[in-house]
Amino acid sequence: MRILGLILAGGHSSRMGQDKASLKFGRKTLAENQREILVKHHFPVAISSNTSAKTDIAIPVLPDPAEVKYAGPLAGIYAGLQYASTNNYQFVLTMPVDCPIIPDEFFVKMTSAIDTTTCLRIASTPSGLQPTFALWATKLKSDLFNFLIGSENKSIRSFAFAHNVSIVRFDNVYSEGAFFNVNTPEDYQYLQENFRIKDEKQS
């Protein structure tokens, strides 16, 4: 089974006040950090983005398709499923650009024992579901398009729970800083002050 790694970076970063993908984490930007993590785990990589600012990291940049543009993370995921379908990937593994500390266990558990019956897996931590950390079967592309066109509630959760989602639990890693989400300048400062060493470990 071929799996595409997709970095979700299509948001407006409104709470941060600047493009989160370009923020530095150690020696790298957050986008570069996510790319390197995926490459380390042997995944081909693309990035969902509606600006050209991420093109300097030398991976395919997938803007939201016009018919679903700015429909939230699902629009970026749909772009990834389109790309995966065209390029013969059976699955898309998504991760947000603003969560730079990802345990190796994530990649193992999310992609283990997949087959043609696997539909959608979403990660869960002690703080709850992490909908942007997910494994999507490429065959969901048409269903997702119809959902985006026809549904007012365009949340990942709404789509997932109508499509045989499996929840993959990560209960023992959150205290290590895994899945920490950078939404605000305060979050970014906390990341830099408390988890900078993680950047060195993942290099």
Q: Where do the PLM segments sit?
A:
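Nucleotide and nucleotide-moiety/phosphate-recognizing core
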Residues: 1-153, 161-176, 185, 192-199
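Flexible, D/E/H-enriched segments
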Residues: 156
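PAPS-dependent sulfotransferase catalytic core
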Residues: 181
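Cationic, low-complexity basic patches in intrinsically disordered or flexible, solvent-exposed regions
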Residues: 202-203
